[in-house]
């Protein structure tokens, strides 16, 4: 029979959470090209799941204005089309790219269509929604246009509700500080 010891030190009550970084992810954009999140080191990043047929689709216009206003301040927006909520993103990657450009002039990086919840959730969204991975907080994607704010080191700092506009004063303050 084996012998084992259990430590009852009060300092062991807090489980250490290992933070990972978004910089570890290699993705594919809407054009089928490789996009390394490590290329965003030193920049603040807003990650947002998008949809073309949603009541919140107007946020594309705000996102594009923000991207153009703050990209010189080391701020980037990365969009992730997803069809998880009432099938509001039914198009192909090519159709999504055309829609975004034609209707909103989107120039910020847009990744290929992914799943942001469920058994086929993309690994990046597993990271964003799991405290054990992101070191910040457990969450779930509530709807299209939920925003995740990532600091210059690739760590999750804030989660913004889908209904909160991207240019909310709290977000602008976060970009500027």
Model-derived features: positions:
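Thiol-/selenol-based redox modules, centered on thioredoxin-like
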Residues: 123-126, 131-177
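N-terminal "domain-start" segment that seeds a small globular fold
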Residues: 9-38, 58, 123
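Structural microenvironment flanking redox-active thiols in thiol-disulfide oxidoreductases
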Residues: 56-122
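Amphipathic alpha-helical repeat scaffolds
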Residues: 49-53
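Bacterial N-terminal signal peptides
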Residues: 1-5
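Proline/glycine-enriched tight loop/beta-turn segments at coil->beta junctions
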Residues: 41-45
């Amino acid at each position: 029979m084996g012998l084992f010891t259990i430590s009852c030190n009060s300092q062991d009550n807090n489980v250490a959470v290992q933070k990972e970084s978004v910089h570890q992810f290699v993705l594919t954009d809407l054009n089928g090209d490789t996009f390394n999140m490590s290329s965003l080191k030193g920049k603040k990043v807003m990650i947002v799941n998008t949809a073309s047929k949603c009541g919140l689709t107007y946020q594309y216009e705000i996102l594009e204005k923000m991207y153009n206003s703050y990209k010189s301040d080391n701020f980037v927006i990365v969009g992730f089309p997803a069809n998880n909520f009432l099938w509001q993103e039914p198009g192909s990657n090519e159709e999504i790219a055309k829609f975004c450009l034609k209707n909103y002039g989107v120039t910020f990086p847009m990744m290929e269509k992914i799943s942001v919840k469920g058994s086929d959730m993309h690994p990046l969204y597993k990271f964003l929604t799991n405290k054990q991975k992101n070191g910040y907080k457990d969450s779930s994607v509530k709807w299209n246009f939920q925003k995740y704010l990532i600091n210059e080191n690739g760590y999750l700092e804030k989660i913004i509700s889908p209904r909160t506009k991207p240019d909310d004063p709290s977000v602008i303050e976060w970009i500027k500080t």
